[in-house]
Structure formats: C-alpha cells, structure tokens
A protein has these predicted regions:
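Glycine/serine-rich phosphate-binding loop and adjoining beta1-alpha1 elements at the start
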Residues: 40-56, 62-147, 213, 221, ...
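Feature captures the FAD/FMN-dependent oxidoreductase FAD-binding
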Residues: 87, 149, 154-158, 206-256, ...
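Phosphate-coordination loops involved in phosphoryl transfer and adenosine-cofactor binding
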Residues: 151-154, 222, 293-296, 368, ...
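A conserved FAD-binding loop/helix module that cradles the flavin
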Residues: 306-309, 316, 462-496
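C-terminal catalytic lobe of FAD-dependent flavoproteins
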Residues: 12-37, 42-45, 367-369, 375-376, ...
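Glycine-rich Rossmann-fold phosphate-binding loop(s) that bind the pyrophosphate
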Residues: 158-162, 301-303, 464
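FAD-site-proximal beta/loop scaffold in flavoenzymes
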Residues: 261-294, 394-469
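Beta1-alpha1 glycine-rich phosphate/pyrophosphate-binding loop at the start
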Residues: 5-32, 41-44, 57, 68-82, ...
Length: 499
C-alpha cells in the first residue's frame, strides 16, 4: 500500500461525461479519460483492505458482492499509484481476458463492495481498469502472444459473445487449435449487437479480435451452426465443442393488439441501429433501421437494455419516451435490510434516463405500470397503448408476492413505437436440438452443479446459455471455467489457473 492516507487525502474523481444535450448528437462513447497523473491519485485512494470484498465475487442475498473474476483490484490500484502501469496490466490480465469490455459495460460490482464506500465514495476501480487497458494498447503492451507449442487438439466454440471469446482465448493460450463460429457477420455477440456504440464502441471489439486472430484463433462468421452448418459435422471434425450461444430468446408481452405494426423486441431495435451506423460511416440512413424519429416511444422494461433503448430512441429524434417498470421505485439509499457489502438495491439514474430528463424535462420511468392493451389504427399500425397500474399482493396459497393489476387504474397514451426489453428466456432451441443436449425448466443447458459438460459426450456449455441472462463479467468467468474443464478433459490435467 503505497499511500496509507490516500483515501483521506484525495477525493474520488470520475471520468467527465459530455453533457446530455451534447452527447445525444452522436453515437460515440462520451466520457473523457483522466490524465495519467490524475488516475494515479485515484489508485492511491485504495485502502488495501485486510479483507478486500471488492475482489470476492461471492453471492450475498441472491446477488454478487465484488468481482466474479476475482480481479486483484487492490494490487493494480497500488501499482498505478506507483507508476507501474505495465505490471498493473499484467496483473489485470491474469484474471480478466477482456478489461477493454468490462471497464466500459460492467456495473462495477467491485466498487459497490468497496470498504472505502462505507463512509465516503468508493475507489474508482472501474475507471482505473479502463486507464490500465487503454494505456496498455497505447504503449504496445497489449499485443499478440501466440502459443509456442500446439497440442494437436481442436476445439469448436459456437458463439462469439464474452463467454465464447474467453474460452477461446484461454484454450488457444494452452496450445489447442480453436475455431469460433458466429452466425452474425462479425464476431462479438451481444457485445457488438446488444450493447449500443455509445457504451462500447465497436472498434474496441475489432481491436481485440485482431489480436486473437494473430494469436491463431480462427473466426468463421455467417455460420449458423444447427441450421446451415450441421452439428454432426462439427462433432466429427473437432475434439471438443463448447456451446456459448447466449440467452437470445426475448421474453414477450402478452396483451391484446400485440400483432400491431410498430412493436419490436429491444435487441432487434438496438441491432438494427448498430448495423445501420456501421454501414453508413456512423450516420443513420433512413429506411435502414427501426426508427424512433418523431415517434412516441414506449420502452417496456427497466433494466440496462431498457435504458439503452431510451438513449438510442433519443438519438434517433423521438417525440417522447416512456419507460415502464413493473416494480416500485427503489430507495435512493441503502435500507437496513440491504447492508454493505451486499449489492445496493437503490435507484440509479443511468445515461439514457439522464438524457430523457434533459430533453423532455422529466424522468421517463413510470413505476408499477404495464401495458394492458395495444391499440391499432385501421391499417393495423400501433397508435396508442392502454396502461394499467400494478400493486404488490401476496398469494394466499404460495405466500409469494406478485404484482397484480389495480382495477380501474387504466389510462391511454399515444404510442407509435413499443420496444420490449423484458429480459430473455434462454437460448434458441435449434442449437440444443441439433446437438441433442438437455435443457432445464428455464431452458438453460443442463449440467451438473459447478460443471460445464452436457449429457452429450465432448460437448460443453457456458455463459448465458448455461447460467441464464447475466452480466458480461459472469459470462467471462464461465468462459474461463469451461476452458479449464475442456482442457482437463483433453489433456488429463490442466495448467489453466483460474482465480
């Protein structure tokens, strides 16, 4: 610990964000990095706790506390304070294959478990992580390092999201020949088409993919395994197969009028925008995407994807935006029932909501509300939505609390575009059926607890396809763990050390 009083001497300093009214004019990342000197002082704020909850990644009250990757946060915080940026990068790389992704899109579980955050603002570990990886690219530390020896074993990874990429990265380091199959035109999975460019610029993905290709990983895009590529051919050609296809089945909304023109799943909306931007030099060309321009938009869902839809709709030029949340508004601060270091169940106003407040003058979120009916015009186009309030009631038979409609609370609003961001229900079943793997009642691939091997010999599963919809950081962890299990099955032992 290079600065024992750092947390008292220096205040937290975050990367400055461009103002909401300015950043909605573009689709680029909108935070300005701190100078290296400023970032080093942020590293000095780390207390080097005796029990560093920031790196624990343990479940508490049903949520993770600390980093699931067990990143050595206090170590690299101290290293950057002392100016040892290369060593900080090497220490970060030990536990995290993709800090360029997590430092942009992770909700910073480490910071919410930070001991410093008990009495003042937490250490800016996410910002420090960003600075470490970007400095590594700038200085040439982040570069290809192909394995010196090949094992002669071949592994197929189906899906190029964070879990598939993490598994491919580690297995390639071990010396296995890895081929990643991706049904889309470019690798990245949800990183590319499920997360907007203003949160994760796509050249950041391309930069890392280029290194992985230089290290010997083969990417085959436009290959839809289970449809235009036979599972039997994959099983015949490769020694092991990892299914990492994500949780791509969106949860639908059942309401009269659901067939109206103008209702889309959030992932299709976000994907169409990203594809249109990259096809037209980061400009939206009319007719090439699902447009919110001039429309009254309703976003159904209060999570990260819903917020992304709010921010994207505003950049399109939406006339109005409402975001519906089934649950009541969370408290502004922790309650006694939600103590540190549990994940804080508090109200967070994210970038999209901040932008809506700046543009429209009010928070777009409407709590304890859902759609009762979609109203169509004579041509079948969506024109209005009937909303209804919800309240919490306890089921007398099960004792479970559930949100139920409040009779007589209906009201009607204008709606030209509805975006359903209600979560996902597992992977599309044509892949699991093609390989013959079993799924559980939640439609996730079925394995033994703590294991990744499926009921089919030599076939493994990881990521959201295995654990269900989750965070990028959890997907990376699953990719690392499945790589270790696959390596051991191939070699009889493994030297892939996972924290």
């Amino acid at each position: 610990m290079g600065k024992p009083t750092g947390f008292m001497d220096y205040e937290r300093q975050d990367k400055p964000a461009e103002s909401p009214l300015e950043r909605i004019k573009h689709f680029n990342e909108f935070h300005t990095p701190l100078s290296k000197e400023e970032q080093e002082l942020q590293g000095a704020r780390c207390m080097a706790c005796g029990v560093p909850f920031c790196q624990s990644g343990k479940p508490l009250a049903g949520m993770a506390s600390g980093c699931p990757l067990h990143n050595l946060v206090p170590e690299w915080n101290d290293l950057i304070y002392n100016g040892n940026w290369k060593e900080a990068y090497l220490r970060l790389k030990k536990t995290n294959n993709f800090p360029e992704f997590t430092s942009r899109v992770c909700p910073a579980l480490c910071e919410n478990a930070c001991t410093c955050g008990l009495n003042q603002e937490a250490v800016a570990s996410k910002s420090n992580e960003y600075a470490i990886i970007e400095n590594a690219y700038e200085m040439g530390y982040a570069k290809a390092n192909p394995p010196k020896v090949r094992t002669g074993k071949k592994v197929a990874v189906i899906g190029s999201g964070p879990s598939g990429l993490a598994a491919a990265d580690l297995l390639n380091r071990r010396g296995h020949q890895v081929t990643v199959f991706e049904r889309e035109d470019k690798p990245g999975g949800l990183l590319r088409y499920g997360i907007p460019n203003m949160k994760l610029e796509k050249q950041v993905i391309d930069r890392k993919i280029a290194i992985m290709e230089e290290e010997g990983i083969i990417f085959q895009t436009g290959c839809n395994v289970g449809k235009d590529v036979k599972a039997a051919d994959i099983l015949k050609e490769y020694d092991r197969v990892i299914l990492a296809c994500g949780a791509s089945n969106p949860r639908d909304i059942k309401a009269p009028g659901r067939d109206a023109q103008g209702i889309y799943f959030a992932v299709d909306f976000l994907k169409s925008t990203t594809k249109a931007l990259w096809a037209n030099d980061m400009k939206l060309k009319t007719g090439s995407y699902i447009s919110a321009k001039g429309k009254n938009v309703i976003v159904i869902g209060g999570g990260d994807t819903g917020n992304d839809c709010v921010g994207t709709s505003i950049r399109h030029g939406a006339k109005s935006v409402l975001q519906l949340e089934m649950m009541p508004k969370a408290p502004d601060e922790r309650t006694p029932m939600n103590p540190w270091p549990e994940w804080p169940r508090v109200c967070k106003t994210d970038y999209g909501q901040q932008e809506a407040i700046a543009v429209f003058g009010s928070d777009p979120r409407v709590y304890t509300t859902t759609v009762k009916e979609f109203v169509k015009d004579k041509k079948g186009n969506l024109c209005k939505a009937v909303l209804i309030k919800l309240e919490s009631k306890t089921d007398e038979k099960t004792g479970r609390k559930m949100m139920v409609p409040v009779e007589g609370s209906e009201y009607t609003v204008d709606a030209d575009l509805v975006l359903i961001a209600a979560g996902f229900l597992g992977s599309q079943d044509y892949v699991t059926k093609a390989f013959g793997v079993e799924v559980n009642e939640r439609t996730n691939v079925k394995t033994e607890a703590g294991k990744y091997s499926t009921n089919v010999k030599d076939v493994f599963a990881a990521g959201d396809m295995h654990r269900g919809q989750s965070l990028v950081v959890w997907a990376i962890r699953e990719g690392r763990e499945v790589a270790r299990e696959v390596d051991e099955s191939l070699m009889g032992y493994t030297n892939l050390y996972i924290q």
